[in-house]
Curated annotation (Swiss-Prot):
Assembly: Homodimer.
Presence of keyword Mitochondrion: no
Compartments it resides in: Cytoplasm
Tagged with keyword Thylakoid: no
InterPro entries listed in its UniProt record: aa-tRNA-synt_IIb (IPR002314), aa-tRNA-synth_II (IPR006195), aa-tRNA-synth_II/BPL/LPL (IPR045864), Anticodon-bd (IPR004154), Anticodon-bd_dom_sf (IPR036621), Pro-tRNA-ligase_IIa (IPR002316), Pro-tRNA-synth_IIa_bac-type (IPR004500), Pro-tRNA-Synthase_IIa_type1 (IPR023717)
Organism: Exiguobacterium sibiricum (strain DSM 17290 / CCUG 55495 / CIP 109462 / JCM 13490 / 255-15)
Record-stated family: Belongs to the class-II aminoacyl-tRNA synthetase family. ProS type 1 subfamily.
Keyword terms: Aminoacyl-tRNA synthetase, ATP-binding, Cytoplasm, Ligase, Nucleotide-binding, Protein biosynthesis
Pfam families: HGTP_anticodon (PF03129), tRNA-synt_2b (PF00587), tRNA_edit (PF04073)
Catalysed reaction equations from the record: tRNA(Pro) + L-proline + ATP = L-prolyl-tRNA(Pro) + AMP + diphosphate
Protein name: Proline--tRNA ligase
Length: 566
């Protein structure tokens, strides 16, 4: 490809609204342009990268036995109503109505649609298992699109769905997809970590996320410093290692705490450490209000609470709902005398002579003994903290930031039961299809790669997904001898199977070199002043100095350099 013909509108300045490095560089290097908040056009360079990522995905998915199909982006509301997700999914689901007042959704996921397709077709255990995948645009009306492709409203995704007759078959396919994802993310050049995660709005009973490690990542990864344990912060387990405090419980007593309404303020008023207090938070689920308790220096993990309750959704109760139920407001809430379900973290059970709200204005209880003063169900309910004991007993946990680029789910019968998708087992009895679901953010993966592969001059593409293999530069595009040598090199490299971007523009050398660094192709060849002597410069984009090479030896030198690159 000759660069004089390539549509590649580069920018010299960093766009003011671009926070993430990948957002800045992909805009500056002419890979994409923004059309609206969270909506982008992929220009030719980006399309080449995306196509290579998609090719790797197709190779590994098909190699793992999956079959590609393509489903519509517009989905009938009735399908989402069958599973209840039309109401549950919330405002992120983009909805529309056609001229006949029929309701539709722009696909955020395709569980309902794929289930509607197979429920009349996969009607016997003899036709199972099956794994179907597609690569397609997805849509989510993000409240605050940010970081370019890392959180957009329209994005490219690979989603796959497997159907099984037994749980054992699902487990096998889950591991099959886990292994395929490991190969995919390794091939595209990502440093990543698979972590235990929450299934969120998708549902199901087991899931792993694949995170690309990056400082800009919105997710916190918890990992052991001495083992392979890793989990999303929401799912990282806190070990029940607490023993009851060795002190005699004193009589429960009400005390006036004035306008102190935070754990920090109340602890200061009473002259007690925060870990001697009980933090109370009230949540609302479809089951009603529930009170969550953690130690004062800990934070309630609402995902753990949701999973413990088996709730479909969970949110913090409003002040009005709390006032109606407890005749009090946040800041003085507590479990004593509360007429609602109470779930507490293990650390609370170990407290003696602690502090909690009295459900009265400006009043708290002191000398609270959980085993004596209220009843609660105990479970792991808090967010872990750095330095906690690793759940597997090996070492302690540390935190890192990650970008979620993929996720695998064990859906079970969550969708098949709701949509009456059944098959006949060996005994002729109807059973719900057992499902798995497997997603990869294709456009997000491109952005995540940039977050890991760049320097102060621009992008450094891993060779597997670079838009071109080689950047060939005629340093002086007005010099006939340089252009002639460059043309010869261009033909030789192309004939040898390399994809080459040939900068034949009549621009200054500094502009060409800056653009080359910004675009970040793996190998660069400069055809300059020594071209008449049959000498060119060869260098790798990732580090390394330019090396003078005889033109006759160039092809072999390029092969050798390219093979040694990541």
């Amino acid at each position: 490809m000759k660069q004089s013909k390539l549509f590649m509108p580069t920018l010299r300045e960093v766009p003011s609204d671009a926070e993430a490095i990948s957002h800045q560089l992909l805009l500056r290097a002419g890979f994409m342009r923004q059309n609206a908040a969270g909506i982008y056009s992929y220009l030719p360079l980006a399309k080449r990268v995306l196509s290579k990522i998609e090719t790797i995905i197709r190779q590994e998915m098909e190699g793992a036995g999956a079959q590609e199909l393509l489903m519509p982006a517009i989905q009938p509301a009735e399908l989402w109503e069958e599973t209840g997700r039309w109401d549950i999914y919330g405002p992120e689901l983009m909805r529309l109505t056609d001229r006949h007042d029929r309701r539709f959704a722009l696909g955020a996921t395709h569980e309902e649609l794929i289930t509607s397709i197979v429920r009349d077709e996969l009607n016997s255990y003899k036709k199972l298992p099956v794994n179907l995948f597609q690569i397609q645009m997805k849509y989510r009306d993000e409240r605050r699109p940010r970081f370019g492709l890392l959180r957009g409203r329209e994005f490219i995704m690979k989603d796959a769905y497997s159907f099984h007759s037994t749980q054992e078959s699902l487990e096998e396919e889950y591991q099959n997809m886990f292994d395929a994802y490991t190969k995919i993310f390794t091939r595209v050049g990502l440093e990543f970590r698979p972590v235990v995660a929450d299934s969120g709005a998708i549902g199901g009973s087991g899931t792993h996320e694949f995170h690309a490690l990056a400082a800009i990542g919105e997710d916190t990864i918890v990992y052991s410093d001495q083992s392979d344990y890793a989990a999303n912060l929401e799912m990282a387990e806190s070990v029940d290692q607490y023993t009851k405090q060795d002190k005699a419980p004193e009589a429960l007593e009400e005390v006036h705490t004035g306008d102190a309404k935070t754990i920090e303020a109340v602890s200061s008023v009473l002259g007690l450490p925060e870990q001697e207090s009980i933090k109370t938070v009230v949540f609302k689920t479809e089951q009603g209000l529930v009170m969550a308790l953690v130690r004062g220096d800990h934070e309630v993990n609402d995902i753990k609470l949701k999973n413990y309750l088996g709730a479909l959704d969970i949110m913090m109760a409003t002040d009005e709902e709390i006032e109606q139920a407890l005749h009090s407001t946040p800041g003085t809430l507590g479990p004593i005398g509360a007429d609602m379900k109470i779930v507490a973290d293990y650390a609370v059970r170990a407290l003696t002579n602690s502090v909690c709200g009295a459900n009265k204005s400006e009043t708290h209880y002191v000398h609270v003994d959980p085993s004596r003063d209220f009843e609660a169900e105990y479970t792991d309910l808090r967010f872990v903290e750095e330095g906690d004991v690793s759940p597997d007993g090996q070492g302690h946990v540390k935190f890192a930031r990650g970008i979620e680029v993929g996720q695998v789910f064990k859906l079970g019968t969550r969708y098949s039961e709701g949509m009456n998708a059944t098959f006949l087992d060996e005994g002729g009895k109807a059973q719900p299809l057992i499902m798995g679901c497997y997603g990869i953010g294709v456009s997000r993966t491109m952005s995540a790669v940039v977050e890991q592969h760049y320097d102060e001059r621009g992008i450094i593409w891993p060779k597997a997904i670079a838009p071109f293999d080689v950047h060939l530069i005629a340093v002086n595009g007005k010099n006939a001898e340089q252009l002639e040598v460059a043309e010869t090199v261009y033909r030789e490299l192309t004939a040898a199977g390399f994809s080459v971007l040939f900068d034949d523009r009549k621009e200054r050398a500094g502009v060409k070199f800056a653009d080359a660094d910004l675009i970040g192709l793996p190998v660069r060849i400069n055809v300059g002043k020594k071209a008449p002597d049959g000498i060119v410069e060869l260098k790798a984009r990732r580090g390394g100095e330019a090396e003078e090479i005889q033109q006759a030896d160039l092809l072999e030198a390029v092969r050798s350099l390219y093979e040694g690159l990541q």
